[in-house]
Amino acid sequence: VGCPVGCIFCESGRNGFVRNLTSSEIVQQIILLRRKVNRIVFMGMGEPLFNYDNLIKAIHILRDRYGLNFPTDGITISTVGPVDQLKKLREEHLKIQLTISLHAATQSARNRIIPHMRIYAIEDVVKQALSYSERHNRKIVFAYLLLPGINDRPSDVRQLAKWFRGKKVMINVLQYNPTSNSRIKAPQKREIVAFKHQLEQAGLEVTMRVSHGREINAACGQVAKT
């Protein structure tokens, strides 16, 4: 409930952090849907890896044939990448999908975008994510919310290419969903398309995520504790 990370584009941490969910509360969210679920993504509000033990226990229950018997390939953890927890996750025999909320190509830009994660060097986050990919033979998705004037420079493209060209990586360029932070300038769609093209020209695999739920303030970055 709430979030301690403090991304500048996200409402989830606006009113602070209250507590982590228990493993049973996590699993119950799937059960309460009362319909066929073919994909589970741990994201929305909060940092999953800061609730590591309950998260891993919930995933084991979801995967267990006496639990929900959910396929491993259908489970994704979306994380800002706390390095110690990424190292632990690498050693788990889960082989789940991993998305890293990177949002920057330099330490200074990431410190600005995700200020409460400045204790983790961006190079270490990238290194551990790629190590997970190599160990488990999984393509890693790096989420990149485009913020004009902050993370959209040609040097950012070059750095991303230096890290990820030739790796099992996909860059997911995200659109900013409006929040109460009036200081953020949302990019035009043409700017997002142009940045995507620059990344592709640099030899990277890139996609653009279509955001759902914006009309009810339930899209990525808009979910807040009330």
Describe each model-derived feature in a short phrase.
Residues 25-28, 116-131:
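Glycine-rich S-adenosyl-L-methionine
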Residues 130-141, 146-226:
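Auxiliary Fe-S-binding modules of radical SAM enzymes
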Residues 28, 32, 54-61, 88, ...:
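Alpha-helical scaffolding segments of alpha/beta enzyme cores, especially the outer helices
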Residues 40, 75-77, 98, 140, ...:
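Hydrophobic/aromatic residues located in beta-strands of well-ordered beta-sheets
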Residues 21, 50, 54, 116-121, ...:
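Alpha-helix N-cap and loop-to-helix initiation/capping positions
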Residues 1-96, 106-108, 131:
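Conserved Radical SAM active-site core
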Residues 91-94, 116-117, 159-161, 225:
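Short, solvent-exposed amphipathic alpha-helical segments in soluble enzyme
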Residues 46-49, 68, 82-86, 95-119, ...:
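Conserved radical SAM core fold
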